[in-house]
């Protein structure tokens, strides 16, 4: 809390957003050493004014990659920290609900790196319910056994990484819902659209250019949500996915903006959410 107060009070407002903090760790980045030095100088002056001391031996300056919180961060990418993958790599078949919850806790921290994580993990979450008996013995080939091995394989895939979001480029979000749950992908493109293109969202609609994935999200439907009509689930899926990506959307430059894609054509018409009960309150 002391770090947050100090930075909010003593850092210049135009560079406050350049600093990230978690517990007692601070990090910032720049494209040039000169710019990085100016940020470092501002931070030292900020801590001095706040009366906060830091240990010089713990300072890293001018490096191309750092470990921060649960991640390894570079200029372009963010990937899971190797120390966080060790418990998953060493995890054997769970023999109790406690062990299963520990496994899910480790993997949930990195769910944004995996497509459909929330839907794949649904059989495992079901086993953590009070009224659901834990399988003894653990049976191979069951839905929960397949889910356990799929998640473990996904998490330990060495190619897992996410692109760092560029707030000056347009953000794209693809949302979809199925019978099992909803999911979304936030991504950007490396190249700018052609000069004079007014609607980048329409221009990129059928683009075959490589996408730079910024984050994945997914979640299985609850028993109640599974009973809702398809139109309701599609609308609810979009709403909840946008809520999950709210921070990504709100940190976009005003000129860059964001575009949301859905394959549910009926909901794209004007007034499609009117006069449909609770859907009217979800109208965006």
Language-model regions: role of each:
Residues 2-12, 34-55, 85-96, 135-167, ...:
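Inter-domain linker/hinge segments that demarcate the starts of reverse transcriptase
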Residues 17, 22, 60-163, 168:
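C-terminal reverse transcriptase regions that engage the nucleic-acid substrate
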Residues 239-284:
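RNase H catalytic domain
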Residues 1-40, 47, 113-117, 205-206, ...:
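Active-site palm subdomain of RNA-directed nucleic acid polymerases
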Residues 18-20, 25, 51-53, 58-60, ...:
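Beta-sheet entry/capping signal
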Residues 12-50, 67-79, 88-89, 189, ...:
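Catalytic palm subdomain of template-directed nucleic-acid polymerases
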């Amino acid at each position: 809390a002391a770090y947050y107060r100090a930075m909010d009070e003593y850092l210049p407002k135009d560079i406050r957003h350049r600093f990230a903090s978690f517990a007692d760790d601070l990090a910032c980045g720049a494209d040039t050493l000169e710019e990085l030095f100016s940020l470092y100088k501002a931070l030292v002056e900020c801590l001095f004014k706040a009366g906060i001391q830091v240990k010089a031996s713990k300072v890293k300056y001018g490096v191309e990659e750092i470990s921060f919180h649960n991640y390894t961060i570079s200029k372009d990418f963010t990937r899971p920290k190797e120390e966080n993958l060790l418990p998953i790599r060493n995890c054997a078949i769970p023999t109790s609900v406690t062990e299963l919850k520990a496994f899910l806790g480790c993997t949930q921290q990195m769910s944004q790196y995996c497509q459909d994580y929330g839907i794949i993990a649904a059989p495992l979450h079901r086993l953590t319910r009070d009224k659901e008996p834990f399988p003894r013995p653990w049976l191979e080939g069951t839905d929960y056994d397949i889910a356990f091995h799929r998640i473990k394989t996904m998490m330990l895939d060495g190619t897992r990484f996410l692109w760092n979001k560029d707030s000056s480029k347009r953000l794209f979000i693809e949302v979809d819902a199925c019978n099992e749950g909803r999911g979304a992908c936030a991504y950007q493109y490396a190249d700018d659209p052609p000069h004079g293109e007014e609607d980048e969202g329409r221009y990129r609609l059928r683009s075959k250019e490589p996408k730079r994935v910024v984050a994945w999200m997914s979640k299985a439907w609850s028993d109640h949500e599974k009973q809702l009509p398809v139109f309701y689930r599609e609308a609810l899926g979009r709403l909840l996915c946008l809520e999950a990506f709210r921070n990504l959307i709100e940190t976009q430059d005003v000129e860059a903006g964001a575009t949301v894609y859905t394959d549910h054509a009926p909901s794209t018409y004007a007034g499609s959410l009117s006069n449909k009960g609770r859907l009217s309150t979800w109208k965006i």
